[in-house]
Amino acid sequence: MTNKKFKLAAMSLATAVAVSAVGPSASAVTYQLEKGDVTVGQDGTGAYSYQNQTDGKTDNVYVDQDTQNNGQIIITQAEGTKTDNTVTVEEDVTNEKGKRDVDIILDGVNVDTSDTSTSTDTPAEVPADTKEDKTIIKVGEGANVDLTVKDSNLTTGGNGIDIGVNLKDDDDNKETNVDLTLDNTNINLTEKDNTAGIVARDHSKVEVTLKGENTIDGKEALEDAAQEAEDAKKEGMSSPNRNVEGIRVGGENAGDDSSGEGASLTIKGDETSDQGSLNIDHTSTGMVISNDSDVTLTDNADVDIKHTEAGSSTQGGRGIVQRGDLTVEDKSSLTIDTVGSGAYKIDNDQEGLVYGNNGYGIDSTDDITVTGDSTLEIKGTQSSAIYGGTGSSLTVEDSTLNIDSNGRGIDYEGGAGDITFENSEVDISGNGMGISVAPGGGTNITFDNSTGSVSAQNGTAIYGPESNGKGKLTVTNKSKVKLEAPTGIYAGFDEVEISGKSKVTSIGSVGMMFVGGQSGATKLHVTGESEYNLQMKGYAHALRVNLSKNPSSILVDQNSKLHLSQATKGASAIVLGNGATLTMDNGTLITEGKFL
């Protein structure tokens, strides 16, 4: 939160000494949550709190008048008990004119609002207002508070923590600011119909600090959806869309829609101790970043998204649906593991859930930036690890990217932006393609002072746009890149440049297929003491320069090297089409092995 108040400014020295001697927890206003719901509100006097107990409402305790403990609102629970009571921060609670921030601490609570039973039956669908009632922590729009949830279990039949809620039914698009600390806390989702562990609604700014190990788990909700789908199938019916999301940033609730307005979520590690972590497990979508919203992982944050499954959700089967900027910075880590799509299945031998196929790691239409010694790792995806739609871009700087996908590694549409690796380590492994750009695309792919590999088991390591592509593939500034696939480069680029003492090693049947860029031709330029080393195996041409509409060219200059070798029996080392050229200008051409 901004504009933090100096909380001891109004205290006398004598009072400060007294507080120090007693300790803040001994004199704080403390509520036992099992005794009733807790509400934080504000009136003309300032921010206050109270509890609705069985024998009535307690007196308001004002933050500024609680001089012995700096106004902290502490909510605990008797050990061994469970409650369905909740916490609500009303709209516009800021204590803006007071001396202290509104500081709410839930410590050791065990809340379960998952019971949806009635006297007759369990409803197939929980009404929206009922789900809101079952949300455990609600912060109204326009509020500005600190919120800590420590050593707690939140099992919810609605959302876990919902920020920026329109509680008065007169949505004014007010900005909401929350500093949220998660400290060894578990959020368990049990409702299958449009719920999330953490929601930052439109116009919310939320900073999450992670301490210890924290979890958002939707397994119970997904199993319920799986059973629903099985039952519907038996009846010859389709099951309704179900969205169980780990985190939703922007919009007004979880669901198929990813529209939103100006929400921002920052997830931070704990600077004072070991790295804090957040594990998001068993959801239809691990995180949704809505339009005009953004998410940043910083300060050594560690976020792990596992086991996302689509079911009948239109946005499901994705680790992240990204319609706004995603940044991983300052030694932070984002891991996405095991992403599937398709019908839910029940299998008791597989702990209830079996995952399908065709899931994306990140479904992106905006900027992904990984910087500052950070790591982005995506593995176990059944479709593309990163699917880039129109407007997307990927920048990895001074960091690490690891991709191991059963589909494509990076798959960009024609309208997608650039892919840049600078001072980074990159390891991309896909099945059909390592990096792919759709026909007519203008994506520039750059390796700048970077090392790594791009591989594809059954296709092409780097698949440029088809003919008429507008992009460029550049490997420069002492980069070392290994391509391992049946075809190394499918060059629909205008130019492929290897420069600045860089080396590209290509292992496979075909090193490069020249299919022509926007000009109808592709230029391969190996320059600046660089090397293009093609280690071929199989009966094929190492360089196919005869596929473009207009004549393509190869230029090797400035003491650079083109090295072609064949381990088995191959076709021609280089096949030139009509008008194609091969020029060695202070360059070296080496061929060895069993070429024709």
Predicted regions and their residues:
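Bacterial Sec-dependent N-terminal signal peptides
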Residues: 1-14, 18
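Boundary/junction segments of secreted and surface-exposed precursor proteins
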Residues: 29-42
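Acidic Gly/Asp/Thr-rich repetitive segments characteristic of extracellular carbohydrate-active
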Residues: 39-96
